[in-house]
Amino acid sequence: NAIRFLDRVPTDRRNLIQLGFKHPHYNLDCPDRFYQMYDPAAIRWPTIASPEDYFGPQPGFAVYEAAYIANGRWTPEKSGDEAWRQVVRAYFAAISHVDHEIGRFLRALEASPIAETTTVIFLSDNGFNLGNHDSFHKMSQWDSAAHVPLAIWHAGMEPAEVAMPVSLHNVPKTVMQLAGLPPRPDWTSGQSLLPLIDPAFGRYDDSLSPVTSVFGTLSVRPSAEGYRNL
């Protein structure tokens, strides 16, 4: 338990806590009070892309459904409005449950002896299209699927916000630079994100763009402004 570890954490050496949550992956089971935060009747369908922005059924998505969603036999948007609302409600509830647990950990960290010497990196592996663009999957670079939380807190670092799309491949080299260590020579992917926060850390190469390649599909999210399909 991460909170119990903070009660006995050694302060004379480096420590690493990797705190992961399955939610909001299926199954979307959490304490009832989090479901009660959301009224299914108040949930509205997201804006569907205009015809010229919707690229239609893709073979890769069919493979994804077959592998992950009941062999392709069921997805919420195929089962009617009420089924979709209940799934989205459960998805939101699962996120709120994670928010609650993260808050518990951060409060415990703030009260611990390592609060001022600890770096916190908060991220998610992917978002999800909950009907956005007439889809119910994650295999795309649309904002609903690719725009995930990525936050870095480090004692003494001035707050800054970065709008540029970046890749999670950058996180390992960011951690190493924060620790004052060189990246491993076999890490050929990614770059440290710290120059985006403070130029004193060096230069960030913004000519590189996040890419997703899975199930025979390829999506590119250019870092340059002006190339964005929301």
Tell what function each PLM region has.
Residues 1, 5-117, 121-165, 178-187:
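Active-site-proximal cap/lid insertion segments
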Residues 126-132, 172, 177-230:
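C-terminal cap/loop subdomain of S1 sulfatases and analogous C-terminal strand-loop tails that border
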Residues 167-171:
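An acidic site on a long C-lobe helix of protein kinase domains
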